[in-house]
Regions:
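Polysaccharide-binding and catalytic clefts of secreted carbohydrate-active enzymes
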Residues: 122-309
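N-terminal carbohydrate-binding accessory modules
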Residues: 13-58, 71, 86, 409
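The substrate-binding groove and active-site-proximal loops of carbohydrate-active enzymes
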Residues: 28-39, 64-79, 126-145, 167-174, ...
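Carbohydrate-binding surfaces of carbohydrate-active enzymes
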Residues: 213-216, 259, 290-293, 298-690
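Short, acidic/polar
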Residues: 37-53, 144-150, 267-277, 343-351
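Aromatic-lined substrate-binding rim segments of carbohydrate-active enzymes
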Residues: 45-54, 60-123, 152, 249-256, ...
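Conserved, mostly hydrophobic/aromatic
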Residues: 30, 51, 59, 88, ...
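Short, well-ordered coil/turn segments that N-cap beta-strands
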Residues: 24-28, 55-57, 89-95, 157-162, ...
Length: 690
């Protein structure tokens, strides 16, 4: 019985934008909802003209069009879709066609109420909103298959169809009896015996021992919240269950349209699903990029740096295939607490950053604002006035022209000498841990800051999962990798012993893959020998509370959040010490030679100045190619068999002068050498032919 829940994953092909379209184009488009405007043929005709004027070459159709495709059960109408695709294709615009399964029609919920989701409080949803169907439901999957088969029958042969877009922003748990049953089967398949599960979950705590798998319930809000292993396995199951649902779509689509690639829109640092697992069902990955521009507590430069991390996180799901952004806003969103406009120049630079970080496409939500619904005030290329001479429309047109100039980079891949390890299981375990800072562990802030630190040194970095090979990297960073799964310690040990450099931080290797604390000291799984340190205690600082780190040259840097107390081995070099509190003089940063390589450890959350000292020393020792960049300038690099592409992005409002190699600036068409001055939110993309 459990075995039938293992999805036989499709072996994906290596699609690139060139192989998808048979032509070297960089995707420039947006989410288009003609189904909301069928009573206005004049607008539909004008849309295509305006798309062409704006430099668009793709449009995403049908994301939430199920009720228009199938207004009543078994009654289908795809005529408007075919007509729309015809108009677009005649104008040189390709269609990315969504399966409309992100929201079901009202008639379906009324006739088949068993497909409704059940929330964590045990209450069944009413029909409404989106992501509102149980992914386990056989009836829902049957209806999904029906609509997909009809879609393929109607437009699967259309020359403008270039990819399938599965559902939309997948996510959400379901706690219905059917999902609970599947969860128990999943647990049986994983643990085999109830004794093994009891040990892994440490159920002796608070007398929560299970006698049988049938006693197990999901972690309801008003139920079992004390077993961290249960909570983690529920998150893992939710990812597995959603991936199994996605497989039910991809398997059918690959059978019906084997030459049309499949993707979906992921959501940056999304907590609900493990994207390293979900990506197995996709031919390439896309994501929706909605940075929080204009926050008073965060600079534009920091926001760009966090976006660069998000690009690296998503592209790391499929490292050797270019990604693109499926959605971004040309102006503002409608769901932040305060919704500010992008400042002039930011949209263009955001698009260029996407390409610099390995993307082969930049697309918007939405093409035209809808007249009603909760997204009526969400930014769009075309506003309610329908004009093509607005500031936003001109901005998008100029951005698309700049993106078009980057056509030569299509299919090239980022050249990264360093990698950060990010693991969704570890993230979930840390967030659920009852300790440290209970509500906010600040993992995202830390991983983004350390990724930015590598970039400040001019070193591009990937963000990869724990299962990925480390062979291509000189430096590997383990930021707050709270969970170290059995065997990962040996992987790091071999990497360092063979000449690699690793940088570990506080909260490394506290628990195993069941959230049980490693015994014998931290970091566990043999990593103490690699780093030459043992973390004996952890001090958590209040917001606004700081310590200092003192370097041998007398310079100091600030510390916030966490301070680990270390014991060091005799052959471990102390690079910096605490400057305050009872642990003044204890090691904060260390270096340990191990085999042919080197292991650095940072025991506290230091500021950028403190991290810079340790990171530059580590990367210099590893032989990384470093640069000295002005504050606020990002550097990214892509490479293919023909050329190397160097990107320099000024994320500030002041001019910055950067040293560049000799080559052609693709954005201006001019030859550059030695130095280039970048204006406010300016950029250059230097192509150096091999």
């Amino acid at each position: 019985m459990p075995g039938r829940y293992k999805a036989p994953y499709f072996k994906v092909k290596r699609f690139t934008m060139k192989t998808i379209t048979k032509a070297p184009i960089l995707f420039r488009g947006g989410d288009y909802n003609p189904d909301q405007w069928l009573d206005r043929p004049d607008i539909l005709e004008k849309d295509v003209e305006m798309m062409k004027k704006a430099g668009m070459n793709t449009a995403t159709l049908g994301v939430f069009a199920w009720a228009k495709y199938e207004p009543q059960e078994g009654a289908y109408d795809f005529s408007w879709l075919r007509e729309t695709m015809d108009r677009l294709y005649a104008a040189g615009i390709y269609t990315e066609l969504a399966t409309p399964c992100g929201a079901k029609p009202n008639w379906m919920a009324k006739k088949y109420p068993e497909i409704l989701r059940v929330q964590a409080n045990g209450v069944t949803d009413h029909q409404g909103m989106r992501h509102n169907a149980c992914p386990s439901s056989p009836i829902y999957r049957e209806k999904v298959h029906n609509i997909i088969e009809k879609l393929v029958e109607a437009v699967g042969d259309h020359p403008g169809l270039i990819l399938w877009h599965i559902s939309n922003e997948l996510g959400g748990d379901c706690y219905c009896p059917r999902c609970q049953t599947r969860f128990r089967y999943w647990l049986r398949d994983k643990y085999k015996t109830i004794d093994a599960l009891n040990h892994a979950w440490w159920t002796g705590f608070w007398s929560h021992h299970y006698n049988d798998f049938d006693e197990i319930e999901p972690p309801f809000e008003n139920g079992e919240q004390s077993l961290l292993g249960l909570k983690l396995d529920w998150r893992r199951f939710t990812t597995w269950n959603m991936t199994d649902y996605v497989h039910s779509e991809t398997e059918l689509l690959h059978k019906l349209t084997p030459n049309v690639p499949i993707t979906t829109n992921l959501m940056e640092y999304f907590p609900g699903l493990d994207y390293h697992y979900l990506q197995k069902e996709l031919d390439f990955v896309c994501w929706d990029s909605y940075p929080h521009w204009g926050r008073p507590d965060r600079s534009i430069t920091t926001t760009f740096a966090m976006t660069a991390f998000d690009h690296a996180l998503i592209r790391g799901c499929k490292r050797d295939v270019p990604f693109f952004t499926m959605e971004s806003t040309p102006s503002l969103v409608n769901w932040h607490e305060y919704n500010k406009l992008k400042r002039p120049g930011v949209n263009r630079l955001q698009g260029l950053q996407t390409v610099a970080c390995g993307g082969d496409g930049v697309q918007y939500f939405q093409w035209r604002k809808g007249r009603g619904g909760t997204e009526q005030w969400h930014g769009a290329v075309v506003d309610h006035d329908g004009r093509d001479d607005t500031r936003v429309f001109k901005d998008v047109t100029e951005t698309n022209a700049a993106l078009n100039a980057l056509t030569p980079v299509i299919g090239s891949l980022p050249r990264a000498e360093a990698a950060l390890i990010f693991d969704w299981d570890s993230r979930w375990a840390l967030e659920d841990a009852w300790g440290m800072q209970i509500q906010q562990k600040n993992l995202r802030e830390t991983v983004c800051a350390l990724h930015e630190q590598l970039g400040r040194c001019g070193v591009d970095a990937d963000v990869i999962g724990v299962e990925e090979s480390l062979d291509r990297y000189k430096v590997v960073v383990l930021p707050m990798l709270y969970m170290v799964k059995p065997g990962f310690g040996e992987k790091i040990r071999q990497f360092v012993a063979n000449g690699g450099t690793v940088i570990g931080t506080y909260l490394l290797g506290y628990v195993n893959d069941s959230t049980l604390a490693w015994l014998g000291g931290f970091p566990g799984d043999g990593l103490r020998e690699v780093f030459g340190v043992t973390a004996t205690e952890l001090d958590t600082l209040y917001p606004g509370e700081h310590n200092t780190v003192v370097f041998p040259d007398g310079s100091k840097a600030a510390i916030q959040d966490y301070c680990e107390l270390l014991e060091t081995r005799d052959n471990t070099d102390v690079l910096a010490t605490y400057g305050e509190d009872f642990y003044k003089g204890y090691a904060v940063a260390t270096h340990h030679a191990f085999g042919k390589g080197h292991a650095y450890y940072v025991a506290a959350r230091m500021d950028a100045d403190g991290n810079a000292k340790v990171f530059r020393a580590a990367m210099a020792q590893a032989g990384c190619t470093m640069q000295t960049l002005p504050d606020g300038v990002e550097y990214h690099c892509r490479e293919d068999e023909r050329a190397v592409y160097h990107f320099y992005l000024n994320t500030t409002e002041t001019d910055k002068t950067v040293a560049v190699p000799t080559g052609a600036d693709l954005l201006t068409g001019k030859t550059v050498s030695r130095e280039v001055t970048l204006g406010r939110y300016g950029a250059c993309a230097v192509e150096v032919v091999k």
